[in-house]
Amino acid sequence: MLPAQHKLTSPRQFRRTIKGGRRAGTRTVVVHLRFNDGEDAIAATGPRFGLIVSKAVGNAVVRHRTSRRLRHVCMSLMRDGVKGTMLPANVDIVIRALPASGEATSERLERDIRKALSTWDI
Protein backbone atom coordinates (compact mmCIF):
# COMPACT_ATOMS: atom_id res chain seq x y z
CA MET A 1 0.00 0.00 0.00
CA LEU A 2 1.27 3.46 -0.86
CA PRO A 3 1.49 5.90 2.06
CA ALA A 4 -1.06 8.72 1.83
CA GLN A 5 1.58 11.40 1.23
CA HIS A 6 2.68 9.54 -1.91
CA LYS A 7 -0.78 9.38 -3.54
CA LEU A 8 -2.50 11.71 -5.95
CA THR A 9 -5.99 12.02 -4.53
CA SER A 10 -8.00 14.71 -6.27
CA PRO A 11 -9.22 14.82 -9.86
CA ARG A 12 -7.48 18.20 -10.13
CA GLN A 13 -4.09 16.62 -9.35
CA PHE A 14 -4.65 13.90 -11.97
CA ARG A 15 -5.81 16.44 -14.55
CA ARG A 16 -2.83 18.75 -13.98
CA THR A 17 -0.39 15.86 -14.30
CA ILE A 18 -1.97 14.46 -17.45
CA LYS A 19 -2.62 17.77 -19.22
CA GLY A 20 0.43 19.72 -18.11
CA GLY A 21 3.10 17.07 -17.93
CA ARG A 22 5.16 14.85 -20.17
CA ARG A 23 4.06 11.47 -21.50
CA ALA A 24 5.78 8.26 -22.53
CA GLY A 25 4.15 4.99 -23.44
CA THR A 26 4.92 1.32 -23.78
CA ARG A 27 2.83 -1.68 -24.75
CA THR A 28 1.32 -2.04 -21.27
CA VAL A 29 1.28 1.46 -19.73
CA VAL A 30 1.33 5.17 -20.45
CA VAL A 31 3.29 7.20 -17.88
CA HIS A 32 2.54 10.90 -17.32
CA LEU A 33 5.07 12.95 -15.34
CA ARG A 34 4.85 16.52 -14.08
CA PHE A 35 7.17 18.50 -11.85
CA ASN A 36 5.37 20.49 -9.14
CA ASP A 37 5.84 24.18 -8.80
CA GLY A 38 4.75 26.75 -6.27
CA GLU A 39 2.92 25.57 -3.15
CA ASP A 40 2.81 21.93 -4.26
CA ALA A 41 6.60 21.85 -4.51
CA ILE A 42 7.07 23.40 -1.08
CA ALA A 43 4.75 20.88 0.58
CA ALA A 44 6.15 17.88 -1.31
CA THR A 45 7.29 15.04 0.95
CA GLY A 46 8.26 12.74 -1.89
CA PRO A 47 7.04 11.68 -5.31
CA ARG A 48 3.28 11.22 -5.67
CA PHE A 49 1.69 8.50 -7.78
CA GLY A 50 -1.74 8.02 -9.30
CA LEU A 51 -3.10 4.97 -11.10
CA ILE A 52 -5.73 4.74 -13.83
CA VAL A 53 -6.95 1.20 -14.49
CA SER A 54 -10.09 1.23 -16.65
CA LYS A 55 -12.56 -1.51 -17.52
CA ALA A 56 -10.68 -2.02 -20.78
CA VAL A 57 -8.00 -3.83 -18.75
CA GLY A 58 -10.42 -6.58 -17.72
CA ASN A 59 -13.00 -7.54 -15.15
CA ALA A 60 -12.82 -6.42 -11.52
CA VAL A 61 -10.47 -9.23 -10.47
CA VAL A 62 -8.00 -8.43 -13.26
CA ARG A 63 -8.20 -4.67 -12.62
CA HIS A 64 -7.52 -5.07 -8.90
CA ARG A 65 -4.64 -7.48 -9.53
CA THR A 66 -3.17 -5.02 -12.02
CA SER A 67 -3.59 -2.14 -9.54
CA ARG A 68 -1.80 -4.12 -6.82
CA ARG A 69 1.07 -4.87 -9.19
CA LEU A 70 1.33 -1.22 -10.22
CA ARG A 71 1.33 -0.07 -6.58
CA HIS A 72 4.16 -2.52 -5.90
CA VAL A 73 6.12 -1.01 -8.80
CA CYS A 74 5.51 2.49 -7.39
CA MET A 75 6.92 1.39 -4.02
CA SER A 76 9.93 -0.06 -5.81
CA LEU A 77 10.46 3.22 -7.68
CA MET A 78 10.35 5.20 -4.44
CA ARG A 79 12.85 2.83 -2.83
CA ASP A 80 15.27 2.27 -5.74
CA GLY A 81 14.72 5.23 -8.06
CA VAL A 82 15.27 5.18 -11.82
CA LYS A 83 18.66 4.44 -13.39
CA GLY A 84 20.29 4.52 -9.96
CA THR A 85 18.98 7.97 -9.00
CA MET A 86 16.14 8.63 -6.60
CA LEU A 87 12.94 10.26 -7.83
CA PRO A 88 12.75 13.96 -6.91
CA ALA A 89 10.31 14.91 -4.16
CA ASN A 90 8.50 17.43 -6.36
CA VAL A 91 7.28 15.05 -9.08
CA ASP A 92 3.79 13.68 -9.77
CA ILE A 93 3.45 10.49 -11.81
CA VAL A 94 0.23 9.06 -13.26
CA ILE A 95 0.36 5.52 -14.62
CA ARG A 96 -2.42 4.60 -17.04
CA ALA A 97 -2.79 0.85 -17.53
CA LEU A 98 -3.49 -0.25 -21.10
CA PRO A 99 -5.47 -3.42 -21.92
CA ALA A 100 -2.26 -5.46 -22.35
CA SER A 101 -1.33 -4.77 -18.71
CA GLY A 102 -4.06 -7.13 -17.51
CA GLU A 103 -2.11 -10.09 -18.87
CA ALA A 104 1.38 -8.76 -18.10
CA THR A 105 3.55 -10.06 -15.28
CA SER A 106 4.79 -7.83 -12.48
CA GLU A 107 8.28 -7.93 -13.95
CA ARG A 108 7.00 -6.81 -17.34
CA LEU A 109 5.04 -3.93 -15.82
CA GLU A 110 8.06 -2.77 -13.82
CA ARG A 111 10.34 -3.02 -16.86
CA ASP A 112 7.88 -1.01 -19.00
CA ILE A 113 7.40 1.70 -16.37
CA ARG A 114 11.14 2.05 -15.79
CA LYS A 115 11.67 2.20 -19.57
CA ALA A 116 9.09 4.99 -19.89
CA LEU A 117 10.57 6.95 -16.98
CA SER A 118 14.12 6.57 -18.30
CA THR A 119 13.22 8.61 -21.40
CA TRP A 120 13.37 11.73 -19.20
CA ASP A 121 16.26 13.07 -17.18
CA ILE A 122 14.74 13.09 -13.71
Swiss-Prot record:
GO terms under biological process: tRNA 5'-leader removal
Keyword RNA-binding: yes
GO MF annotation: an example: ribonuclease P activity
Entry keywords, A to Z: Endonuclease, Hydrolase, Nuclease, RNA-binding, tRNA processing
Pfam family, one: Ribonuclease_P
EC number from the UniProt entry: 3.1.26.5
Reaction catalysed by this enzyme: Endonucleolytic cleavage of RNA, removing 5'-extranucleotides from tRNA precursor
InterPro entries per UniProt: Ribosomal_Su5_D2-typ_SF, Ribsml_uS5_D2-typ_fold_subgr, RNase_P
GO CC term (a single one): ribonuclease P complex
Task performed by this protein: RNaseP catalyzes the removal of the 5'-leader sequence from pre-tRNA to produce the mature 5'-terminus. It can also cleave other RNA substrates such as 4.5S RNA. The protein component plays an auxiliary but essential role in vivo by binding to the 5'-leader sequence and broadening the substrate specificity of the ribozyme.
Entry similarity comment: Belongs to the RnpA family.
Binding partners and assembly: Consists of a catalytic RNA component (M1 or rnpB) and a protein subunit.
Matches recorded under HAMAP family: RNase_P
Name of this chain's protein: Ribonuclease P protein component
